[in-house]
Amino acid sequence: MSQFNFVILYVADVSKSQAFYADLLGRPALEASPGFAMFEAAPGVRLGLWKASDVKPAAGRPGGGELCIVVPEAEIAPTAAAWAAKGIEIALAPTRLDFGLTFVGLDPDGHRIRVFTPAG
C-alpha cells in the first residue's frame, strides 16, 4: 500500500508562508520558487506550499482541516507562549479536550496548526 507522506497547502504568498514554516519547523525549505516551496516536515514527510492562484485545476474554497503536531504535555503551554511571542495568532489557547491537552495556531493563510498531547 502507498504511504501518506506529502501534504500541500494552497497559500496566497509563497515567500511569506515559506518564512513562517522555516521558522516554525526550524529548517530551511528543501526547494523554493516564486510559486512553490517544499519542506521536510518530519523524516519521510514533506510539506508543500503552492501559490493558490497557480494551482491546476483551480481550487475552490477548501474545507476545514488541520496540520497536527504531537508533543509532550509539558511543552503545550511554553510552545503556545513562544508562538504568540513570535506573532503567530493563537486561535485556541491551551485547553483540555476529550482527546487531550491542545492549542491551535494559525499560519499566514489561516491554516490551523494543532499542537496536542493525546489523552491516556
PLM regions with names:
Residues 13, 107-109:
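Acidic active-site catalytic centers that drive phospho-/nucleotidyl reactions
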Residues 1-5, 27-72, 77-106, 117-120:
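Vicinal oxygen chelate
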Residues 17-21, 83, 110:
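Conserved active-site tyrosine of GNAT-family acetyltransferases
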